[in-house]
Swiss-Prot record:
Gene that this sequence comes from: trm1
Reaction catalysis annotation: guanosine(26) in tRNA + 2 S-adenosyl-L-methionine = N(2)-dimethylguanosine(26) in tRNA + 2 S-adenosyl-L-homocysteine + 2 H(+)
Name of the protein in its database record: tRNA (guanine(26)-N(2))-dimethyltransferase
Organism: Metallosphaera sedula (strain ATCC 51363 / DSM 5348 / JCM 9185 / NBRC 15509 / TH2)
Annotated GO MF terms: tRNA (guanine(26)-N2)-dimethyltransferase activity; tRNA binding
Binding site for Zn(2+): C244, C247, C261, C264
Highest taxon of the lineage: Archaea
């Protein structure tokens, strides 16, 4: 197997040469004997910053592949304690050892099934970055965490989480209902809801530190809080997401609601169970922002700063509305987002969708602003 060297952050890595596994001029990381995805660099850059704030005493990189995450946590996040690198692929295990030596760091390299290993260890931070759904690994990942431990998890199975595939949604996440127009946020809330349920079985509650959507995946950092009472409190933050199929009115509720829109009387679509609380901790985001200057060498430092600003602004609001969906329901042209936000006043864009916004204004006022902004746009000649 031919290897090539890449630089990511402060890490030097040898990875399988993509040219050896290309097909008709195209390359998919899944075709390589060891998985390395350059499209996940932003995910890893954010994670390096987040782990520097978490400052765990020990780390498990449960599905290490090349070892890039664990290596970067040592070299960039300042992790001083033991780092466990695990992968069941023997080729990966060999490559991880090479990369540890290349970077001059020590770590324990294991070849084990991730679920089996996570039931045997106790660490301060477990990183779960599976190929596809994290659902089969969540219970054991939570059990691997010591008191007040933190779980970092990536999910790429958007079809199941967002409700595009209702059978997958039900099978993997126990979700009932239909896909909503704010599906990107719904998916993140469903993933958090699944984590709550898996943690509660182990008498643990959760505190979300950071959650976001980017490109084609979700990324979450969730702190565990031991105790049955904390587990019960987290379960109280589960509920159902709703959206009127006629007028577009959306809301979340922990109580079971009539399937009739309180605004127009239309049929309510629903999706859940899902987390209905906040999914970002403002103090955690603030500390990440404060530390970002130390990570100015990252190619994504500006993008990370922008993401943190988005998350901070939108955290206090409920689900977002899509301006194109509301305009379609009103049978008007879609207005410019800036005009709409100016009309609403207390409203923000969302990182989930460039067409999305969040507002505390009454729904009737939101609709009036959509109509008014559209009319102004039309009369101004666009």
């Amino acid at each position: 197997m031919k290897l090539t060297e890449v630089i990511e952050g402060k890490a030097r890595l040898v990875i399988p040469d993509p040219s050896e596994f290309s097909r008709e001029g195209k390359f998919d990381p899944a075709w390589s004997p060891v998985f390395y995805n350059p499209r996940m660099v932003f995910n890893r850059d954010v994670s390096v910053l987040a782990v520097s704030v978490i400052s765990p005493p020990s780390v498990l990189d449960a599905m290490s592949a090349t070892g890039v995450r664990g290596i970067r946590y040592v070299k960039e996040s300042g992790v001083k304690g033991e780092v466990l690198f695990n992968d069941k692929n023997p080729v990966s295990v060999e490559l991880i050892s090479k990369n540890l030596e290349l970077n001059g760091i020590t770590g324990k390299v294991l070849r084990s099934d991730a679920n089996s290993l996570m039931h045997q260890v106790k660490v301060g931070y477990t990183d779960l970055d599976p190929f596809g759904s994290p659902a089969p690994y969540l219970f054991s990942a939570i059990s691997s965490l010591r008191r007040k431990g933190v779980l970092g998890v990536t999910a790429t199975d958007l079809s199941a989480l967002e409700g595009k595939s209702r059978t997958s949604s039900k099978r993997k996440y126990g979700v009932q209902g239909s896909r909503l127009s704010y599906s990107k946020e719904a998916g993140l809330r469903v993933l958090l809801g699944k984590i709550v349920k898996e943690a509660s079985v182990q008498e643990k509650g959760i505190r979300p530190l950071m959650g976001f959507y980017h490109d084609y995946y979700y990324r979450l950092f969730v702190k565990m809080e031991d105790g049955a009472k904390r587990a019960d409190r987290s379960l109280e933050s589960l509920g159902t997401l709703y959206e009127c199929d006629r007028c577009g009115y959306s809301f979340m509720s922990s109580d079971e609601c009539e399937r009739k829109c309180p605004v127009c009387g239309g049929e309510l679509k629903y999706y859940g169970p899902a987390w209905i609380g906040e999914f970002n901790d403002l103090e955690f985001l603030k500390e990440m922002k404060n530390r970002l200057t130390e990570f100015s060498y990252l190619s994504n430092s500006v993008k990370i700063s922008e993401l943190l600003e988005y998350l901070e602004r939108e955290n206090r609001f409920g689900p977002y509305y899509r301006v194109d969906v509301l305009a379609s329901r009103l049978k008007v042209n879609m207005p410019p987002m800036n005009s709409l936000l100016g009309c609403l006043g207390d409203a923000v864009r969302t990182h989930f969708d460039p067409r999305g916004f969040k507002s505390f204004r009454e729904f009737s006022e939101i609709l009036e602003c959509v109509k008014g902004s559209s009319a102004t746009y039309e009369t101004s000649g666009r």
